């Protein structure tokens, strides 16, 4: 990023999410829990009372389940109110490069049923954006998630006007998150829904992206949420 590469370019080169997934694969469940436990108590020390914790850095059935099991342990062993969010559709792993449809199949046919069988997630999330997952792929995963009782959240409009807001509203997502690139069309769509727009100014600051149009959303009467 310091060298001027975009988020999408970094992902194409195997960095970013994919690099984090490699490191997570090499970390044991107990090791991951100890790291996360330290961060949870740091958050509590800063006054955080509740957190949505996502998976999404496993990108295989085994490692996604590992992350979600750690989240369950944190729920059971800390005073923080935690909701677990299955984000297997965070990126296409290196093993599925050029075979994105097959990875979506894996999420729908193997990951979601396995997550549901163990009761590991409260929500399902998808990174619906340029260079990641399409509106059609997102809709398919949300439909399967709904069959297993997982309400959607969506990563939307971080990198482009992606259609993620509209698909989120269509499937009654609790929230659509990021929204760095949002037009009046998305704002109007949200006005006629029960979906909450969530903006992430820290992402904009860190990645050098536009800031979400919070003032425009508030002026339109939307209840805007902030996240880190």
Model regions: which residues?
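Metal-coordinating catalytic core of metallo-dependent amide/deamination hydrolases
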Residues: 15-37, 41-42, 49-162
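Active-site-adjacent C-terminal substructures of enzyme catalytic domains
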Residues: 151-152, 160-228
């Amino acid at each position: 990023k310091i060298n001027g590469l975009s988020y999408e370019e970094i992902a194409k080169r195997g960095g970013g999410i994919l690099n984090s997934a490699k490191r997570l694969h090499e970390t044991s469940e107990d090791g991951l829990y100890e790291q996360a436990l330290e961060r949870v108590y740091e958050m509590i020390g800063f006054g955080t009372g509740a957190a949505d914790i996502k998976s999404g850095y496993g990108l295989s059935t085994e490692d996604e389940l590992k992350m979600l099991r750690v989240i369950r342990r944190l729920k059971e062993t800390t005073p923080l109110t935690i909701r677990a969010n299955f984000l297997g559709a965070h990126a296409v792993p290196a093993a599925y490069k050029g075979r994105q449809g097959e990875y979506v199949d894996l999420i729908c046919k193997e990951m979601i049923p396995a997550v549901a069988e163990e009761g590991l997630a409260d929500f399902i999330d998808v990174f619906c954006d340029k260079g990641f997952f399409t509106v059609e792929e997102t809709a398919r995963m949300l439909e399967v998630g709904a069959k297993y009782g997982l309400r959607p959240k969506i990563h939307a409009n971080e990198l482009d006007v992606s259609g993620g807001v509209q698909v989120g509203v269509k499937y009654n997502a609790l929230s659509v998150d990021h929204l760095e690139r949002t037009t009046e069309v998305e704002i109007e769509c949200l006005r006629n829904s029960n979906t909450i727009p969530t903006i992430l100014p820290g992402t904009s600051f860190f990645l050098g992206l536009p800031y979400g149009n919070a003032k425009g959303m508030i002026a339109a009467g939307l209840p805007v949420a902030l996240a880190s």
